[in-house]
C-alpha cells in the first residue's frame, strides 16, 4: 500500500483538489485498496475550514465530492506515516524540508515533476482566480503520478463528442509519435510495437448522450486494446 499526502499552503484549494482527484483516479482504476490519500497545509491560517467554495464547485462540475474535508496542518509525524509528501510549488517544498529537517528518505516531491514539468508550480487560484487552470494542472499531475506508481493510464472518452476527440485523448494519454496516423490500424501498431506510455489501460467510454457514431467508434477502440492484449 502506498500512502500519499498532498501539501499546499492552506489546504483549502490545491492540495485538497489533488487529494480528491487522486482518490477518484484510483477509484476508476480499481486500486482503492492499494492507496491511502490525504492532504495538509504548511500553514495554520485555514485550520478547520472547508475546501474553498470556487474550488469545491470546480470539483463538483467534474463529479467529485469533497464534502467533509477541512484543513489540517502538516505534522512532523507525517514524514514517517506517508510514503510520499507531494507539494504544489517550491514554497511548499521549502516549508516541508524545514519542517522535517531535510528529506533523508527522499519522500518530498513536486506534483508537476511527474508530468515532466520539473520545478513548475500548480497554479494557485487564491491569487490567479483561475480555478479551471488549477484543475488542469492537478489532473495532469495526478494522472502521471498514478502512472508512475502503478503503470495505469486512464483513457477518458466521457467528454468526447467527435471521433477526432477520441484520437486527441489517445494521443494525450499514450504520447505516441505525431507521425502515427489516426486510425485503428495505427493504434494497434502503437499498442503492440511502437513506444507509448503505460502498461495498463483503463478506458472510460463516452456518455450515453454522446453521438451514436462516437460511442460505436469508442467501442471499436476498446476492441483494439483487447486485441492488443490490454
Q: What is each of the regions a protein language model found here?
A:
Residues 36, 65, 107-109, 153:
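Conserved beta-strand segments of alpha/beta enzyme cores
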Residues 87-88, 181:
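Short beta-strand scaffold positions
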Residues 27-34, 100-104, 230:
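Short helix-capping segments at alpha-helix termini
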Residues 1-81:
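Conserved active-site segments centered on acidic
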Residues 151-230:
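Positively charged, polar, low-complexity stretches
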Residues 84, 90-150:
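Phosphate-binding/catalytic loops
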Amino acid at each position: 500500500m502506498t500512502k500519499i499526502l498532498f501539501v499546499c499552503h492552506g489546504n483549502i484549494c490545491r492540495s485538497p483538489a489533488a487529494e480528491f482527484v487522486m482518490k477518484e483516479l484510483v477509484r476508476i482504476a480499481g486500486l482503492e485498496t492499494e492507496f491511502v490519500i490525504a492532504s495538509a497545509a504548511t500553514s495554520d491560517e485555514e485550520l478547520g475550514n472547508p475546501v474553498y467554495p470556487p474550488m469545491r464547485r470546480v470539483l463538483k462540475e467534474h463529479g467529485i465530492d469533497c464534502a467533509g474535508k477541512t484543513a489540517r496542518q502538516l505534522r512532523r509525524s507525517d514524514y514517517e506515516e506517508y510514503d510520499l509528501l507531494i507539494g504544489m510549488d517550491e514554497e511548499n517544498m521549502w516549508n516541508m524540508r524545514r519542517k522535517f529537517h531535510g528529506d533523508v528518505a527522499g519522500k518530498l516531491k513536486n506534483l508537476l515533476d511527474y508530468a515532466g514539468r520539473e520545478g513548475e508550480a500548480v497554479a494557485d487560484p487564491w491569487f490567479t482566480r483561475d480555478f479551471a487552470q488549477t484543475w488542469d494542472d492537478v489532473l495532469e499531475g495526478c494522472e502521471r503520478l498514478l502512472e508512475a506508481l502503478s503503470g495505469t493510464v486512464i483513457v477518458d472518452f466521457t467528454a468526447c463528442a467527435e471521433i477526432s476527440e477520441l484520437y486527441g485523448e489517445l494521443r494525450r494519454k499514450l504520447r505516441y509519435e505525431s507521425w502515427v496516423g489516426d486510425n485503428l490500424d495505427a493504434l494497434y501498431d502503437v499498442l503492440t510495437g511502437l513506444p507509448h506510455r503505460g502498461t495498463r489501460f483503463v478506458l472510460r467510454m463516452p456518455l450515453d448522450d454522446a453521438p451514436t457514431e462516437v460511442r460505436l467508434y469508442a467501442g471499436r477502440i476498446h476492441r483494439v486494446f483487447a486485441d492488443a492484449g490490454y
